[in-house]
Amino acid sequence: MVLDVTWAVRWLTLCAQAMAENRVWLIELDRAIGDSDHGENMDRGFQAVLEKLAEARPETPGAALKLTAMTLMSKVGGAAGPLYGTAFLRASTALGDAAEIDPGRLADALVAARDGIVARGKAESGDKTMVDAWTPAAEAAQAAAADGAGTVLGVLVAAAEAAEAGAVATEPLVARKGRASYLGERSAGHRDPGAASSALILRAAVGAAA
């Protein structure tokens, strides 16, 4: 499987589908510990990404991700827009103008995305945020890429599975960052919506490569 601009556009298309299909679920997660708008914001943001991709027709994966970053920053409200915008922007920079992505560069892009989220949101693992999905995903991607037999699909699968496990693992945590932190102990018992949407995004990347 070659990860090129066709894959990138397919990934972002599947992201939009995932956000539309899981819109109500994300709203419900956010209603429990946030302000109820995460599902609506993510759905709206990725629909806008599809419109921009159709207009611009980017020629490289990096260009597609940069366009995504700019669109999410302008269209997604709350903290998610700047955080996801920074993640996609950092990933696009890591990819550069490469026409195709190898396992090592893919892992670098996922690490860069995680680092961007950490830098922007000032959150750490265990704070009950999307970092709890992205950090295990980035680490799993690095490990998969370091394997001599590692493939791009293997890197994506490892990242998605780690993100999904990380999102589930936010449920018992007490939030230390974001709006959920205002609830204190009452934030425990609920999955973080940002971690949940992060897992959807990384699972969509697998679907685009399958």
Predicted regions and their residues:
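N-terminal loops that bind phosphate or other acidic moieties
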Residues: M1-A210
